[in-house]
């Protein structure tokens, strides 16, 4: 008699995805982030659901409802800070997951990669709308500035912005619809994650060598379930340290001031995980040019498979490409720092140089250095 997990229509899917799934024997801890992202998503949906039970999406009461939650609801502050810092952990895992894909050439699985890019955009949109909900100063002005960027689109821009706002400024209608979308999108993300996994399981996982591992596979359970639990414990430890010791470290103090359309904060900036894109946006003096660069800074990932000129898939044995990769990482950290600084010299010029370097590394230098490496290996 076959095991129920192998014969039951529903359990069979779970079994083939998480238990008997053949996985390469050599995948390192860089492959842990997929499961960590799944846990982050589940945590965000769970904490978000309980937060939504206490939140009111009305400009008059939104700020007070969040304050009430933190002061008067049992462990409400834990829920709130788990959700806020959980988003930070989500993005740390996301960026490491994408970085792993770039380093080891996982983008050659184009379907999985493209769904991943759509997921990244969706998660970013969800996080942006979530930041607006507490209706503090940075929430209001962040929403105003970022939605206003759409007005740079020729001809339809102004109408589009007013349509998104539901009026002539960010107001009650905007807050209500942002709450509706912020609640809905994580469930759409969950469905897209399943599609992401579906495409991944069509090809199987990549591995650090970049060489097909069909001849050397091991079952996902117990080997990688145990390995994933270790990663999970480390992530939960970091998250709890953030939540319990310095819950506001990654937030903005301006968001503890209720939204006031009549007073602009001295430095409007998004959450830390958007600062690199914000720096690229600000580095171009033209509004439309800035918006295009902002979108391209993420969308450029979609052409990675086309820019792959190396005869090897992974960067594991390509020291020159490795140097460029870590230069790209350093450049992104520089952009993140610049995004949080005021618009004045020397920050303006540093931001512009870092933005040029970002696009140059990906579009020009990486494909060129790969060709050089091919030549050095006489391929």
Curated annotation (Swiss-Prot):
TM segment ranges: 33-53, 77-98, 113-133, 178-198, 226-246, 288-308, 320-340, 347-367
Gene Ontology biological process terms from the UniProt entry: mitochondrial electron transport, ubiquinol to cytochrome c
Cofactor requirement: heme b
CDD domains: cytochrome_b_C, Cytochrome_b_N
Disulfides per UniProt: none
Binding site for heme b b566: 97, 196
UniProt binding sites for heme b b562: 83, 182
Localization per record: Mitochondrion inner membrane
Keywords on record: Electron transport, Heme, Iron, Membrane, Metal-binding, Mitochondrion, Mitochondrion inner membrane, Respiratory chain, Transmembrane, Transmembrane helix, Transport, Ubiquinone
GO molecular function, one term: ubiquinol-cytochrome-c reductase activity
Chief location of this protein within or outside the cell: mitochondrion
Binding positions (a ubiquinone): 201
InterPro entries (alphabetical): Cyt_b/b6_C, Cyt_b/b6_C_sf, Cyt_b/b6_N, Cytb/b6-like_sf, Cytochrome_b, Cytochrome_b_C_euk/bac, Cytochrome_b_N_euk/bac, Di-haem_cyt_TM
GO CC annotation, single: mitochondrial inner membrane
Membrane topology type: Multi-pass membrane protein
Family: Belongs to the cytochrome b family.
Miscellaneous comment text of the record: Heme 1 (or BL or b562) is low-potential and absorbs at about 562 nm, and heme 2 (or BH or b566) is high-potential and absorbs at about 566 nm.
Oligomeric form and interacting partners: The cytochrome bc1 complex contains 11 subunits: 3 respiratory subunits (MT-CYB, CYC1 and UQCRFS1), 2 core proteins (UQCRC1 and UQCRC2) and 6 low-molecular weight proteins (UQCRH/QCR6, UQCRB/QCR7, UQCRQ/QCR8, UQCR10/QCR9, UQCR11/QCR10 and a cleavage product of UQCRFS1). This cytochrome bc1 complex then forms a dimer.
UniProt xrefs under PANTHER family: CYTOCHROME B
Name used for this protein in its record: Cytochrome b
Recorded name of the encoding gene: MT-CYB
């Amino acid at each position: 008699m076959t095991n129920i997990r192998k014969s039951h229509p529903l359990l069979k899917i779970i079994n083939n995805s998480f238990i008997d799934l053949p996985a390469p024997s050599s995948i390192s801890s860089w492959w842990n982030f997929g499961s960590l992202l799944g846990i982050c998503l589940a945590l965000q949906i769970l904490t978000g659901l309980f937060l939504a039970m206490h939140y009111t999406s009305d400009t008059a009461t939104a700020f007070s409802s969040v304050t009430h939650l933190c002061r008067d609801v049992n462990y409400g502050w834990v829920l709130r800070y788990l959700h806020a810092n959980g988003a930070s952990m989500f993005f740390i895992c996301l960026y490491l997951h994408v970085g792993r894909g770039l380093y080891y050439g996982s983008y050659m699985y184009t379907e999985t990669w493209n769904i991943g890019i759509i997921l990244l955009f969706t998660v970013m949109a969800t996080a942006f709308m979530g930041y607006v909900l507490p209706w503090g100063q940075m929430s209001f002005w962040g929403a105003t500035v970022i939605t206003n960027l759409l007005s740079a689109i020729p001809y339809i821009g102004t109408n589009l912005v007013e349509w998104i706002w539901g009026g002539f400024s960010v107001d009650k209608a905007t807050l209500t619809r942002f709450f509706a979308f912020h609640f809905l999108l994580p469930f759409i993300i969950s469905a897209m994650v399943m599609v992401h996994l579906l495409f991944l399981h069509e090809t199987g996982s990549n591995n650090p060598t970049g060489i097909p591992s069909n001849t050397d596979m091991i079952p996902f359970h117990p080997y990688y379930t145990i390995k994933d639990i270790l990663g999970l414990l480390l992530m939960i430890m970091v998250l709890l340290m953030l939540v319990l010791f310095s819950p506001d470290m990654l937030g903005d103090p301006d968001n503890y001031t209720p939204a006031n359309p009549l007073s602009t904060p001295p430095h409007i900036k998004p959450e830390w995980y958007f600062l690199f894109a914000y720096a690229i946006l600000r580095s171009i003096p033209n509004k439309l040019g800035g918006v295009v660069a902002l979108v391209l800074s993420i969308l450029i990932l979609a052409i990675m498979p086309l820019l792959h000129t190396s005869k090897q898939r992974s960067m594991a044995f390509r020291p020159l490409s490795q140097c460029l990769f870590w230069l790209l990482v350093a450049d992104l950290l520089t952009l993140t720092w610049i995004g949080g600084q005021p618009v004045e010299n020397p920050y303006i010029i540093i931001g512009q140089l870092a933005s040029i370097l970002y696009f140059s590394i990906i579009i020009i230098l990486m494909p060129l250095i790969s060709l050089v490496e091919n030549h050095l290996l006489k391929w």
